[in-house]
From Swiss-Prot:
The keyword Manganese applies. InterPro entries: HD/PDEase_dom, HD_domain, YfbR/HDDC2. Catalyzes the dephosphorylation of the nucleoside 5'-monophosphates deoxyadenosine monophosphate (dAMP), deoxycytidine monophosphate (dCMP), deoxyguanosine monophosphate (dGMP) and deoxythymidine monophosphate (dTMP). It is an enzyme of class 3 (hydrolase). The gene is YGK1. Changing residue 90 to A: Abolishes activity. This is 5'-deoxynucleotidase YGK1. It comes from the Eukaryota. Keywords: Cobalt, Hydrolase, Magnesium, Manganese, Metal-binding.
Length: 215
């Protein structure tokens, strides 16, 4: 009977980082930062698949999301929590990769891999540095993943909004010749009133741009 290979985060850590972790007294801070560095070099799959070269990295996306959350004016929102959630919401992709709906993987398996990665990073690499950081990062990631708080919902919307902004930037860069309309489907997933307003303003600017190409 053939054994089933189950994906595990620890099996996907680069050799040079494993070398750090295998030392008698591992430098866990360095190992963690080296893993996060992978987000700076991994390109966002959706743009790669549409021939955008060069395109943004996962880290680029999360950084601008974090800054965007600072623009929230809703007084009921803890913006500092939003910033934290934005910074960690995709950090499992450092080992899992940027999986899209076009990839041959179920949503359940994608979630399992990401959750296992977050647990592994928090328990095995971050906790030896800081127990409080380990708990906070896991809690913030779950707040986004499970949408358990207002801040998680705002960051979910800003995830979509930032992608739409990036889409428009690439449409402008390629003078409207790249067909990126499929990314506009994210508009319907935005729930909060404030981010809806941002999106409507963005769409008006986008329409004006495409109208100008017809002149």
């Amino acid at each position: 009977m053939t054994a089933v290979n189950i994906w595990k985060p620890e099996d996907n850590i680069p050799r040079e980082i494993l070398a750090i972790l295998s030392k008698p007294h591992p430098n866990y801070q360095l190992a963690f930062l080296n893993i996060i560095q992978l987000l700076k070099t991994q390109r966002r799959t959706g743009w790669v698949d549409h021939g955008i070269d060069p395109c943004e990295s996962i880290s680029d996306h999360m950084y601008r999301m974090g800054l965007t959350t600072m623009l929230i004016t809703d007084k009921n929102v803890d913006r500092n929590k939003c910033i934290r959630i934005a910074l960690v919401h995709d950090f499992a992709e450092s080992l899992v990769g940027d999986i899209t709906p076009n990839d041959p993987m179920t949503k359940e398996e994608k979630h399992r891999r990401e959750f296992e990665t977050v647990k592994y990073l928090c328990e095995s690499i971050i906790r030896p540095c800081s127990e409080s950081a380990s708990r906070e990062i896991l809690d913030d990631w779950l707040a986004y993943e499970k949408q358990t708080c207002l801040e998680g919902r705002y960051v979910k919307d800003i995830d979509k909004y930032e992608m739409l902004v990036q889409c428009f930037e690439y449409e402008q860069k390629y003078n409207g010749k790249k067909d990126l309309k499929q990314f506009l489907g994210a508009i319907n997933d935005i729930k909060t009133d404030e981010v809806k307003k941002w999106t409507q303003s963005l769409l008006e600017d986008r329409q004006a741009f495409f109208d100008s190409l017809k002149e």
